[in-house]
Amino acid sequence: MNARSLSAIITIAKYFDEGELLRIMNSTNGIITVFAGSASRPFAQKMCDYLGVELGKSTTHIFSEGGIYVRADESIRNKDVYIVQSIGKDPNNAFTELIFWIDAFKRASANSITAIIPYFGYAKADKKDEPRVSIRARVCADCIEMCGADRVVTMDLHAAQVQGFFSKPVDHLYASALLCEYARHLGIVNENLVVVSPDAGSAKRARAYANILGCNVAIGDKVRIGHDENPNALEIIGDVKGKTCMVVDDFTISGNTLCKVAYGLMDKGAKEIYAFLSHAIVKEDAVKRIEESPIKMLVTTDTVDNTDVLKNSTKIKVVSAAPLFAEAVRTIHEREPMAYMFEHLPARLMEMSFEDTDK
């Protein structure tokens, strides 16, 4: 730093408090540009609405033989690029498109590239649990980094240790900030509420929710046979008789686990059953199963676009996680601590997250 620059800093310092001055000095010189993969266009648009920026202009084309073509239709040289793409429904094509986007931005001289992956479906494949299988989460992490991503932002990984598969920074967001606030909005948070984990593996998540809401925990004891999506719920550990039960989990595909736990809770005398999930990757049969179950309401986020299959649902409510991801982008861009962000979420974030939920 030369004498002239130092003099300028000393001159302006008297007009700002210490925190504001540090924020200005640390702020990146890049320009935020958000692009959408084909799996997450509505989500990315909501992020842009929150940030007050326009969605990046782009073209995605699927050729007749199934090949994917992507192109940024505006200059991104020296810009900070955020590409939004969930790996949920049709995960193979979604992932391939994501790494093509990252490569395209790298070759177009972006200042930085952040992969925003609202739902990272391959995080379920985090270990070699039988002979001669691939650790798919690690393969995905390697590809994302090799193609040029500088950072990854995702939410509620099925296996949190997947963060360790990346050598670049990973910002791991939590839906609990949104879902617990919506539980309060519903008026179910009181001394009669019990948070229920559908299995022992999710007990840590349930405890985190219970700590936020100030209530007790119960656990569903289940046995999963094979690698299909149809586990057998066996028992409920904990007192749920006459209680309002809030079942929490990271995702559902078939709805089988949730519904079997719900029936188990009813058998134990539960008064009402709600389900709160970070992600839902559902089809018509899963929606039908949930609609016919004892679950009074299922609340999830929009990390995976289920608009078509949920249009006739009376039980499933969707809160938007896009404002939370947008606030994370702002935090990254201004080089602020992510932990501080979660402790000081703006009121407008919750307002935007819930604005379409009760319609």
Segments the model singles out, each with a brief description of its role:
Residues 2-359:
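PRPP-associated nucleotide enzymes
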